[in-house]
Amino acid sequence: MSATILLLYSAKERPCGSQQVMKTQWFTAGSSTDAPSFRNRWNHSHSAVTEKAVLKTTKPFSLNVYEQQLTFSLASESKILFSVGDMLHVVISAKDERHNTVTNIGDFFRASILTREERKTGNQERGSGAVGIITDHQNGTYTATFRLLWEGEVTIRIQLVHPKQAIDVIERTIRKYPIDLVMFRKRYILGKDTIDTKCNVDPAIFKNTSAVCNYSDPHAGARWYCEKVVNISCNTSGYHGTLMPYKNVNGGKGLFSRRFLDVLWFELCYSGNNALKMPIFGSPSQINVKKGRDILANRGRCVRGLVTPQISGFYRNGVWNSLVCKNRHFSSQAGWQQCLKGKTLYFMGDSTIRQWWEHLVRILKMTETHIPEAVHITGPLLAHDPVNNITVNCRSHGPPLRCFWTRTFHLKFGANAIDEIDGGPNDVVGITLWAHFTSYPLEVYKQRMEAVRAAVERLLRRSPETLVVIKSANTSMGNELISGDWLAHKLDLMMREMFRGMDVVLVDAWEMTNAQHWHKDDIHPAEDIIVHELEFLCSFICPL
């Protein structure tokens, strides 16, 4: 996230009424324009009309009041006794003091079911969990639909991530500041002199008439510009980094003045639109599920091109069970080595896929190869296991990248990196792009992903046996209006639509992070979650 926005969530945690906005981290940011039709496992529209008359809201919106009005209950058609395999329907609504429905349409909820287990793994208590599908009926009521996937006492958990009013602030902010929520720099070091220039996806942000270096690449769907320095060629190598807060390259206050932040802070706080993941209470909050049919029976082998259902899996005793296909679990290093023997893996994207590289290197005890002037955060990274002939590569997707200084000659746009891979039956390509694009309009992300998709199509044409894996976005802190789950999920929806029907694998990191309840949300998921993602990846490399 831009360090500028960090002031909104400083260590002092400035209060908004009775709520507090929690701290965030610099590497997440967010903003976007209108999304495609919003149909997903959290919220999607439905045309059903409730029987009871709906009262239009006329009073100014108050988050504190709305939070107290929201509740949930079992749908009238729900059973009293439940068995594994049944569907559970939960109605979410808000009632005013006269018991009329409050019509707040377009809220962003999060729904899951969970069971906390007594068994602990290490010092961490883990349990069972699965997501629910939210339907927005466009009349102030919502339905959360769950599939009951294990027996025992099951707790229903509903959270309000963003009320519609907070989403409006997000979208309004993006329309007003479409490309300047985060700024970047190119740095030249000439002898003892250091020269910084501003960079971004649109030269209009520079607001001057000086010359511009155009590093855009239409083939890669990438737009990138930097201010031109007099007497320095645009082809001169330098360093890429994120612009620090409140300082432009000339030492001034830059775009994000204190006045701008105060105005934004006032709008967020005193409009009652601070965005926290607020728990919604209801009754019953727990149900008892009896033994039923074997949910995991009759799963097929993990092969490319399988459709990912809205509920794609669940945790049981802290272990991920896929509903897509029969997924693997490894109990030893030898199991991983046997699966990956002779394979070359190419990971490309942001730091959430770099975690794959890091954990495979740790699990396999691989030897990292030093690449001159490469930095860990952006790569390129290379590790090798000579005994089992396993090679794992990782590199960033190119700018925009919110990072510390990294050499520009090491940066490569994702589509171009994919085009350099020969492919083959022993090659695995893993891709994810999302975390560094939340601060831009959807069109910027769309152009980049269209180029990545075209590169994947070219790769599969020249080498159909190459395994291509797309890792979705994952849930993160979600407590910020500028960088929460709403923006990431909009990008994720677009990514899923782009790769729909292609001969690729989807690793649903969104659901795997959303369904668990024993870690706090974090843009970088915990180690056990990453291992589950990698085990699912390996289920396609060496299927059962």
List where the protein language model places each region.
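A compositional signature for long Ser/Thr(±Pro)-rich, low-complexity
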Residues: 1-143, 147-461, 465-544
